[in-house]
A protein has these predicted regions:
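ABC ATPase NBD coupling module
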Residues: 70-86, 112, 193, 232-236
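ABC ATPase "signature
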Residues: 226-227
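Conserved ABC ATPase "signature" region
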Residues: 120-137, 245-246
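Conserved ABC transporter NBD signature motif
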Residues: 61-70
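Conserved ABC ATPase signature
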Residues: 142-146, 150
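Helix-to-loop junction immediately C-terminal to a conserved catalytic motif
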Residues: 53
Length: 254
């Protein structure tokens, strides 16, 4: 299971509108792993996530899932990855169809991937809501009527409905107040304990202790530092890493 669900990038590069936004990146993620990609705005974090799920064409290097090379592969070759690797966006409102109910949003990926339906009122749907700390009573509501924290949890429930082995989370706490953000991080920690692989993209190092094992620091579209979370947060070496660390003066690693 671990080998068949492993995502591996080697020398990955991405160019957008003639500008190289990511170069020579190596990354490994499998079930149960917890990796953070951190860096300032414009470092290439979101471009990386989009490339990993085929939304940005990688123009250099290798991207393999379950041992299958995907760079240059036809669209059909991406199908196994697009169920097994799910992405939660920074702004859930832009990713959730405003005309669908919560129940329909969560059921939609199951329809797409040919899984048994989770309909309104079903025990499976209610269990999926409970998993992300949402009440069954919201199942008929639409995204525009929910709070930011509720929308982010619905987006997470929707991603989990595809029964993925890996979850990519793009700045999922950036628009939330701190108590709601920490509640969401606690949910991600619990999912990792269930065997889900987690790739967390963030600029906020305060989210990493107790959540992440390995950290990759991006600056200017390339990896400037990487290492175990405890060691890197305690003694960052690169100026980009030190600047991110200085923005969070109180961490358990010092």
């Amino acid at each position: 299971m671990k080998d068949s669900s492993r995502l591996s990038a080697r020398g990955l590069g991405v160019t957008l509108a003639g500008r190289t936004v990511l170069r020579d990146l190596d990354l490994e993620l499998g079930p149960g792993d917890a990796v953070a990609v951190v860096g300032p705005s414009g470092a290439g974090k979101s471009a990386l996530l989009r490339a990993l799920v085929g939304l940005e064409p990688a123009i250099a290097g290798s991207l393999r899932f379950g041992g299958l090379e995907l760079v240059g592969a036809p669209t059909e070759a991406w199908r196994p990855l697009r169920r097994a690797v799910q992405l939660c966006w920074q702004d859930p409102l832009s990713a959730l169809n405003p005309y669908l109910s919560v129940a329909e949003l969560i059921d939609e990926p199951r329809v797409i991937h040919g899984l048994p339906r989770w309909r309104v009122g079903s025990p499976e749907l209610h269990a999926s809501l409970a998993r992300v700390a949402l009440e069954p009573s919201i199942e008929r509501r639409r995204p525009g009527t929910l709070s930011g924290g509720q929308r982010q949890r619905v987006a997470l429930a929707r991603a989990l409905a595809a029964e993925p082995s890996l979850l990519l989370a793009d700045e999922v706490t950036s628009a939330l107040d701190r108590p709601v953000a920490w509640a969401l991080i606690d949910l991600l920690r619990g999912l990792r304990g269930d065997g889900l692989g987690l790739l967390l993209v963030t600029h906020d190092l305060s989210l990493l202790p107790g959540t992440i094992d390995q950290v990759v620091v991006l600056g200017g579209g390339e990896v400037v530092e990487r290492g175990p979370a405890r060691e890197l947060l305690a003694a960052p070496q690169h100026p980009v890493s030190r600047a991110l660390r200085a923005a969070v003066p109180r961490l358990p690693y010092s």
